[in-house]
Regions:
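Helix-centered, glycine/charged polyanion-binding patches within enzymatic domains
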Residues: 79, 84-150
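Charged alpha-helix within mobile-element recombinases
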Residues: 135, 153-162
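A general structural signal for well-ordered alpha-helical segments in protein cores
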Residues: 65-68, 132, 158
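Short helix-capping/linker segments at secondary-structure and domain boundaries
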Residues: 51, 163-169
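A residue-level signal for conserved active-site and pocket-lining positions in enzyme catalytic cores
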Residues: 44, 129, 161
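Polybasic low-complexity intrinsically disordered regions
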Residues: 1-107
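Structural motif
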Residues: 32-35, 145-156
Length: 169
C-alpha cells in the first residue's frame, strides 16, 4: 500500500518569476491554504513507512489526476491512498484496468462520506501526511533556492535521497 501526495511548490517572488518564465511555471490556487501561488507542484508516491518511492514536478495548474498515472509507472503497489485532489471516477477506472485500487477520501459535504471515509485508512494517511510535513519543516521544500526547472528537480532529488537514507540503518 502506498500514498499519493502533492505539495504546492514555491511562492516565487517577483525576481524569480522572470527566472522561471520560460520553464513552464504558472499560477494556481491552493484550496487548503486559500491562496494563489506561482510555481510548480511536487507530486510524490510514498510508502506507508514514509519512504519516497517516486516523485514528479509539474506546472502549478496541472490537475493532480494527470500526474497520477506517470507517478505509478514501474511501481507494484496495488492499493493507493490519495488526496482529495485525485478524486476522479475516470482515473479510478483507468487505474483499475492496470491493477491498481485507488482510494480517495470524500469531502465532508459529499453524500456517503461518513460511510466511505474509513477511520483506519484516514489514520494511515495522517501518518504519511506527518512524514510529508517533515520534508517541509526539515528541508524547507516549499522555498527552493534554484534558478531553473532542471535545478529544481536536481535539488528535490538530492533532498529526497537524503530523506530516504533515514530508512537504511
Amino acid at each position: 500500500m502506498s500514498h499519493l501526495q502533492y505539495t504546492a511548490k514555491s511562492h516565487l517572488r517577483n525576481f524569480k518569476t522572470r527566472i522561471f518564465r520560460d520553464e513552464q511555471a504558472d499560477i494556481s490556487f491552493n484550496s487548503a491554504k486559500q491562496m494563489w501561488f506561482y510555481g510548480f507542484k511536487l507530486h510524490m508516491l510514498v510508502s506507508l513507512s514514509g519512504y519516497v518511492v517516486n516523485d514528479l514536478v509539474t506546472p502549478a495548474s496541472t490537475h493532480d489526476s494527470k500526474a497520477c498515472e506517470e507517478l505509478l509507472e514501474d511501481t507494484n503497489f496495488p492499493m493507493i491512498l490519495a488526496d482529495l485532489g485525485y478524486i476522479s471516477q475516470s482515473l479510478k477506472q483507468r487505474l483499475a484496468q492496470k491493477g491498481y485500487q485507488l482510494w480517495t477520501p470524500l469531502r465532508q459535504n459529499m453524500s456517503e462520506a461518513k460511510h466511505h471515509n474509513n477511520w483506519k485508512l484516514m489514520a494511515k494517511r495522517r501518518t504519511i501526511e506527518t512524514r510529508f510535513s517533515v520534508l517541509c519543516t526539515e528541508f524547507d521544500i516549499q522555498r527552493p533556492l534554484v534558478r531553473s526547472l532542471c535545478g529544481l528537480e536536481l535539488w528535490l532529488e538530492s533532498i529526497i535521497w537524503v530523506y530516504n537514507l533515514r530508512f537504511f540503518n
